[in-house]
Amino acid sequence: MRNPRSIALLAAALLAVAACSNVGAPASVALTPIRLQLQWFPQAQFAGYFAALEKGYYREEGFDVTIIPGAVEIVPATVVAGGQAEFGISWVPRMLAPRESGADGVVIAQVFQRSPTLQVSFKDKNITKPEDLKGKKVGAWGFGNEAELYAGLRKAGLDPDNPDDVKITAQQFDMEAFAAGEIDAAQAMIYNEYAQVLEKKNPATNALYKPEDLNVISWEEYGTSMLQDAIFASEAWLAKPGNEDVAVKFLKASFRGWIFCRDNAAECVDIVLKSDAKLPKGHQTWQLNEVNGIIWPAPNGIGITDAAAFDRTVQVALDGKILTKPVVGTPWRNDLAEKALAALGDADTKGASWQKATVTLTEGGK
């Protein structure tokens, strides 16, 4: 018969071993579902969010994040206002416009620091400045994406509503009409449509087009640019108990995703390709390189909104008739992004030393 004291000691020892085996094991905690509404289809434009999901950064903050693709007809501000998503990604003017109808979106992190919007033309058109667009067929996407162009035209003394000044032509979200000569100057993002031209063959040479075959007007350089991709949420949602803390943690994880994509571009492109992105690897590699150049360096830290840039954006949106009246209140805040940056500790949140890579494009962006 065993000694009762021995049995007690054995039981205690087994409990101790069991306790030691659980040291450092994560507690079983239910994840909070979070939905993020994109403004466009999955591509490297949104790489940081896909990276945060793939690398487990959102999960580390206690979130089960669903990333919802966008499309032409989807307005993220309306989706968020209707409670179908907690967070959205949007150009700032497209978030502001629904506020005139009662939406309450507020920017909580300004991720893109600079505008990537261009007007692109072939060299033989001799369009080197906005004034040269007079009498030309000028492509515009519409859907609120034309405001920088319209503001630039007006600054150059041209009326986009007057066909005697400039012939505004509806442009698809590609460069096919431009390549066919149906548009003299096409709207393009440096991270997307501009590269689409460089991925096409010049029929005169049977070689790919080169940057020197093109003239480019940058609305950022001309002074009529708008703040674009920002993370926003509903003011009413943020006012509910605990949701500001949720927002800070979401921003922290998202910023980590963008930092990862800055420092690990090749792996980040592979993550994007797994997200059902339609454009091929070569094009996504170019896109991420250019998107990183729009985000970094971030002089005050990723996500911090510059007040002067926001005010300029509002004015451009008013000039472009995206907004019909001055903005009421201050629909942006930096306090949540600042807390997220502080929570990242010693991480490089400014990217001051980051430099663009050289990306060689191939036909079709493959």
Please provide the spans of the model-predicted regions.
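Pocket-lining segment of extracytoplasmic ligand-binding domains
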Residues: P93, K125, F173-E176, I183-K278
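Conserved C-terminal helix/tail region of periplasmic/extracytoplasmic solute-binding proteins
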Residues: D311-K366
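Secondary-structure end/capping motifs
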Residues: P241-T324
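Short amphipathic alpha-helical segments at helix boundaries and their inter-helical linkers
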Residues: Q84-A85, I89, G293-I304, K339-D346
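Short, low-complexity disordered leader/linker segments with a strong preference
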Residues: M1-T32, D346-K366
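Short linear loop/turn motifs
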Residues: T66, E73-V75, V166-I168, L214-I217, ...
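Short, glycine-/small- and polar/acidic-enriched structural segments
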Residues: A27-A180, D184-Y191, P211-D213, I217-W219
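Alpha-helical scaffold segments in soluble metabolic enzymes
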Residues: G48-A51, A97, E148-G152, Q196, ...
